[in-house]
Amino acid sequence: MELTPGAQQQGINYQELTSGWQDVKSMMLVPEPTRKFPSGPLLTSVRFSNLSPESQQQDVKSLEFTVEPKLQSVKHVKLSSVSLQQTIKSVELAPGSLPQRVKYGEQTPRTNYQIMESSELIPRPGHQFAKYAEMIPQPKYQIPKSANLISIPIYHATESSEMAQGLAYKGIDTVEKSVGLTPKLTGRAKESLGMLLQPDLQVPKFVDLTPMVRDQGSKFLGLTPEKSYQILETMELLSQSRPRVKDVGELYMKPLQQTVEYEGITPELKHYFTEAMGLTAEARIQANEFFGMTPKPTSQATGFAERSPRLCPQNLECVEVISEKRLQGEESVVLIPKSLHHVPDSASGMTPGLGHRVPESVELTSKSGVQVEKTLQLTPKPQHHVGSPGIISGLGHQVPESVNLTCKQWLQMEESLEVPLKQTSQVIGHEESVELTSEARQHREVSMGLTKSKNQSMKSPGTTPGPLGRIVEFMRISPEPLDQVTESARTQLQVAQSEEVILIDVPKVVQSVKVTPGPPFQIVKSVTIPRPTPQMVEYIELTPKLQYVRPSEHHTGPCLQDVKSTKLITKPKHQILETVELTGFQIVKTMLIPGPSLQIVKSEELAPGPIPQVVEPIGVALESGIEAINCVDLLPRPHLQELIVPAELTPSPCTQVKSAELTSPQTSPFEEHTILTHKQGLQAVKSTVIKTEPPKVMETEDLNLGHVCQNRDCQKLTSEELQVGTDFSRFLQSSSTTLISSSVRTASELGGLWDSGIQEVSRALDIKNPGTDILQPEETYIDPTMIQSLTFPLALHNQSSDKTANIVENPCPEILGVDVISKETTKRKQMEELENSLQRHLPQSWRSRSRTFQAESGVQKGLIKSFPGRQHNVWESHAWRQRLPRKYLSTMLMLGNILGTTMERKLCSQTSLAERATADTCQSIQNLFGIPAELMEPSQSLPEKGPVTISQPSVVKNYIQRHTFYHGHKKRMALRIWTRGSTSSIIQQYSGTRVRIKKTNSTFNGISQEVIQHMPVSCAGGQLPVLVKSESSLSIFYDREDLVPMEESEDSQSDSQTRISESQHSLKPNYLSQAKTDFSEQFQLLEDLQLKIAAKLLRSQIPPDVPPPLASGLVLKYPICLQCGRCSGLNCHHKLQTTSGPYLLIYPQLHLVRTPEGHGEVRLHLGFRLRIGKRSQISKYRERDRPVIRRSPISPSQRKAKIYTQASKSPTSTIDLQSGPSQSPAPVQVYIRRGQRSRPDLVEKTKTRAPGHYEFTQVHNLPESDSESTQNEKRAKVRTKKTSDSKYPMKRITKRLRKHRKFYTNSRTTIESPSRELAAHLRRKRIGATQTSTASLKRQPKKPSQPKFMQLLFQSLKRAFQTAHRVIASVGRKPVDGTRPDNLWASKNYYPKQNARDYCLPSSIKRDKRSADKLTPAGSTIKQEDILWGGTVQCRSAQQPRRAYSFQPRPLRLPKPTDSQSGIAFQTASVGQPLRTVQKDSSSRSKKNFYRNETSSQESKNLSTPGTRVQARGRILPGSPVKRTWHRHLKDKLTHKEHNHPSFYRERTPRGPSERTRHNPSWRNHRSPSERSQRSSLERRHHSPSQRSHCSPSRKNHSSPSERSWRSPSQRNHCSPPERSCHSLSERGLHSPSQRSHRGPSQRRHHSPSERSHRSPSERSHRSSSERRHRSPSQRSHRGPSERSHCSPSERRHRSPSQRSHRGPSERRHHSPSKRSHRSPARRSHRSPSERSHHSPSERSHHSPSERRHHSPSERSHCSPSERSHCSPSERRHRSPSERRHHSPSEKSHHSPSERSHHSPSERRRHSPLERSRHSLLERSHRSPSERRSHRSFERSHRRISERSHSPSEKSHLSPLERSRCSPSERRGHSSSGKTCHSPSERSHRSPSGMRQGRTSERSHRSSCERTRHSPSEMRPGRPSGRNHCSPSERSRRSPLKEGLKYSFPGERPSHSLSRDFKNQTTLLGTTHKNPKAGQVWRPEATR
């Protein structure tokens, strides 16, 4: 009994969870599902087990989606059991599992009777589907389960008929499997349409599902107590409910009776699981739903679910089950329920109606609604699609009726309260409506119960919401898996599952609808439903893809909606999905089964899509990690292969669907999947999988390839089967799509691709299906993903696949080592071997995608990082730890050479290939060296020197190669820069080793002469001159420096001299010879080097801050010109002031980091120390002690905090990456290891040292340390000299200038400016690396955006550096460049001047701040960096809040850097609209300094979400997690940017320019007081939730719990004197190094100019002196009373004494809850302070606690799941509306309906689950489940309504509208709708909050605005209850605020939401205080 094993895996998992379920499952499933399907579920289970961490995400996703529906059920059942088991095991997904299991109960019942069906259907899904049913069964289940739903109904009918019939149904199942099911289904569906069988089936399914739900519930109860008594109760309730349903639903009486009947059948499950739980939820939901008791069931369900995490999920599940039941029960009305589901979704616009069903409704609307809408909109399609237009007509009528009814009902219901209208709906078509109402109620239930998902769905658009709901659920599941995964996973999984169930039901319905024609319709509808499931899947993809999808599948999230609007623009556009696919495949869909197949492909793409998005997370993730799936499935390889075939087919379908929908969505699926997989699948799958199976990957690849070949055969057979039945369409959904295009080709491609790419299957499938249809575009995306994956993930995974297939012997090394080219070759081989059709597309698309993916480099990198992170788990465990090549020098040099060669080869190979290879190489280098992709790309974007350098063979080839090789390719340059060109040269130069300057001279002829003149410098210069050639040479220089230091630290870490020679000599040959093995070898070498260096350092016991002795060979001396920051002697024409210096010491640093697993890790970073002389060294040594000492205080708590941040942020994400990958994160993980691990160290260290350091350090693992070391060096010197290191360049320069230390000023200024630039650059790099790491984790979905972002970022950096160079030259050469400083000062007016002001103002303070600087050096460095960078991205964002003050002069001097950087596309994109906000902020700045500060803060935070992340980094100072989070956020946001790209990057990027701009006086002013605080708040929020959420579910969750935990304790501790000092430090660090130190120096400084201006002069000066002083002492201790009072307005926003002391008392108090959302509270506090400023101190206090907590749950939770997820969908959507509205209409619309709705509920829900469990447990208790649902529903619907109603406004003012949302109009909308929306929860919250009752409008206002304006009253009431009720009230508040802050937190939209909300809050504060002006003025500001 494979299935029994599968079920037993599942069942074992289930057994673990519930043996009964397994028994039930076994009993039910044992017959046949046990055999064949089990493997599928087993494999799925295993797969999702591997994905388990993400399984919760992806499980939820998987669960929600394809797996969710059926295979998802199976997968989810299995995955749920596995995932849930693993999740339960791992995350206590027992709740999550239960949700998943509940889902999986649903689905497991479904899966069970999916498996039962699979038992019965197993022949069909099981046999044909076995693989397909495993994978596709879930789609097939979804489809079969739609078919299987029909089958399930049949099966239920069969089961109702008997399990025997079900078992007979097995045989029938086989028949129905292909089509028999559909006939049966049709018969039964028609019978079911008669509603007996379908309700019967539905009920049995429901019962089954309920038992599963119960089992899951029981398991979840595990957690069985509730479930047990609930089961008994539920059994009673089932009996009751059935009678009720009988009473209530005449039809349902039948279903209920039949359910009772079935209960007799299902009693196993029912009683077993006491299906009563699910049935109780069901029965209750049915009864309640039928009785309109939805609140009750919801409450029960919620109570249960929250008790109940599963009851709510079970309720959701029950709702889902009811949905299923109803869908099944209403399968007569199946389409009506579906229509209700779908049509409400459709009618709801899928948004209002089916917020929850909107996913289903969107998805189901896509299916039902789409089928209904398809029936209605695509009515032909759904109808003909349904294949039974009669049924569709009947159902279609019902569906249209339902659509009308349901849409109306749903919209009405959901809009009203769903209950009334649902009851109305119920009333409307009593039987039909009862079923519809049951569905309406179910939807109301789902809307109420699933209001979370529905609200999420509604919140999303209902289209996205469904998926978003799911994704939100899924996102919530991401949090849910962690904390409220149980509830959220359950609730959301069950909601998602409910959606999936609805989806499944929709398939059931659809299958019911698509009776016999329905088989295609089953398929199609299944496809449709799987599509919705894919919507969910794509929403799952959206969740992973959310981030990635935000750019790509933003179209799939919103753009999945968009893409599915492309496909089916939203899954409501599942029509369009089917229309796009149907368009592409509507024709295809018109192409009957191909159409349905395509729909199945779409569905299965999406249904498997979900699975492949879960499976594609496994499948596309398996693309990059079909190995992951394979690996996951490697556990159950057959299943995997079966599932992988579906998974890969599914990934392909997903990709295809997405590709079909959108090549971007295709990319989305990939990147979604890859990112999802990376994020979830890769982290989960890859981590699990690759951890588990680099070898297994080989095996699995072999097996999978074999199986895939089998599957290929199966797929080929399946194409026949598809012809035979929808099985192929389902099974080969991707094939189906391609099959639609060409079944044979698809089959062959699919089959072929299976081999080449189970990895590429997802890609190839993605490529294939779209390859036919969208093959090339898709492949373009797939290829980049493949390239990405190939580069490292695919290098690891695809090479595991490819190379495992081809090179099984060298999976890890080959995976790593395989070139993209080799990968491409291998894949091509495999593709050729497998199917040349795909290959045709792949190589081209591969290259095309290479380009695409270069844009998606971030995705690639994130993928790679995540993937390599996962692989590194395996890899590091094996290769890094075990395989420690002894030839470190030669290997490292070889590594560098190989990197260069590989890069060169790739670059030289083709332009596309070269670019792709470059991207791959860059990524490889980045991953290897932990070099942030952003740095690589900007380096790449700095190709000016590239052409010159390329010719140089040795140095260039060695390391300069990287930059030299980038002739026109900026990337090449960056790579060379990063690779050891500089290092070798520098090392040689300094080591006296033969300088390869002549080659460099050849490269740099003119320069090389100079270089020759300055031989030692020339070497470094040779590298630098490449960089320095252009003004961007500084950037490159720093890039190179970072790269060099990084590599140098590796290089140096080994024997730098020896290695240099080796490097130069061996790298040349090796460089070319070992291009392919190089990556793996380089990885290994890097690891070995790191290990060796670590060993050296450990033996030496050298403090991490202290450079090793120069004689150790580990230190690279990089001569740096302090005047220009360039490598001395090369590009620098300045006379060397000293023969010996100044120079950067690039040295390896060891940081002991506590991994999320609690293990201690030694992480190797590059330290950078600027040595100007022995004096500096003295300082350096001082600093060594200082940072170490600082490390000691901060390190333990914040190390833990950081680790926990990492752990909490990426336990799931980073658990894969960091827990598993923590040890072996692959390049990214190596990077993350170095970066994240290093980050904790560095963060600790940096925390200890300075936020800037950790920021700096976190950016780069090695360069981080390097930068950190440099900065530490600088800092040590500066601290010795000036305490401020970050500040020291400016401050110290100013000070020294004031001191008239001309040389020191010049050299120091120059050094420090360059150092700062370097530090900034390195920090940026690190930040980039951190972002890359973090973003890798978080941005995995967003990877595509990263390259652009990187480019923009680095252009910004380049310009900032150029400006910085100028400034440095001016400052450094101030005596020399008298005019230039004026010019620079004129351009960067305040760069030195303001620095002088800032630095000089607190000259004494600086001394005071030395201690503070110890705390704030990193922030100072960040400040420098920001100064240098113009607050580039992170500094811009994070530091500029504080720096906003200091940067306000600096804005003037940085306006040019800002502007120059703003001129950069990154900043342009970023600045474009955030800049508008900034400009508006600037415009309004005087009127609304606080307001705009707040706005700026918020908008800055919005825009500064990267900066926010930085601030979050600083804030989180576990900021390394924050940084990582920030990075992740960046990546996530970059991914979001890809999703939210215009906006996200604009928002995030605007942090570069706009934030710079805002950091310009406006931003800086805005941000400095308010925005900094708000940005602190927001960023903190954003970071804590967003970054957390972006970090990953687990990172988010762990960030939420762990980070919360550590933040709670450690930040409490930090809040306590340690946290105060560490809040000075750590909160600065937490706020952001820049906020920390900028709060110290920058806030000092920024407070000086901006905040000074904002703060009263006294506050300014006080803040300058007092804040600076207090920041050093008081800020550390309490920020000083005056600073507290001064910070009150401004820094309250920031964390000033009030915030610090607030944080101390309040925020510390809150820091346990709030500082958990430390960033949230801090942000909250900051926003609070800003809002406090705006609100009042008490409001600030209230804001502090309330809003902190408010933002804690809402933001963290919101940001956590929502920002991660919603940064994917919601942030995409949030940014979508916010940024998109800001930046694009799509974003706007998506944002407004989807994101708002979605974010609101989604984040509400998702955050609700997590934070609900944490924060919202109170909120939950306060906010009844139904109220939460209702709140969510209403918030969703009202936010949707609001957002929709405010959509124009919101669109017109994204910020304003989000303001609008948060601002009066939307507040009004929110007030009206928010009142309504928030009425329930706000009422309940108000009720709990007390004063909130009367604040309904205020809360609606405050809902939107309340977050914004957690006014003193609101927050005051919310303070007692607002803290706890801040969870509820905040939830209601946060519901809107979630909407706003959610949007604000999760992404830029969250930021914009925060911006809006805060602006609205500010506006509301302003609205309250200056409401019209604030609301409106802020709006323009935000809009501007």
From Swiss-Prot:
Ranges of the Sequence repeats in the UniProt entry: 1593-1600, 1601-1608, 1609-1616, 1641-1648, 1649-1656, 1657-1664, 1681-1688, 1689-1696, 1697-1704, 1705-1712, 1713-1720, 1721-1728, 1729-1736, 1737-1744, 1745-1752, 1753-1760, 1761-1768, 1769-1776, 1777-1784, 1785-1792, 1793-1800, 1801-1808, 1848-1855, 1864-1871, 1880-1887, 1921-1928, 1929-1935
Biased composition (Basic and acidic residues): 1238-1247, 1532-1558, 1568-1579, 1620-1630, 1648-1667, 1680-1691, 1728-1869, 1895-1917, 1928-1941, 1949-1959
Bias kind Low complexity: ranges: 1599-1610
Region (Disordered), start-end ranges: 448-467, 1045-1067, 1181-1287, 1326-1346, 1439-1984
Disulfide cross-links: none
Tissue: Expressed in sperm (at protein level).
The protein's name: Spermatogenesis-associated protein 31H1
Species, as recorded: Homo sapiens (Human)
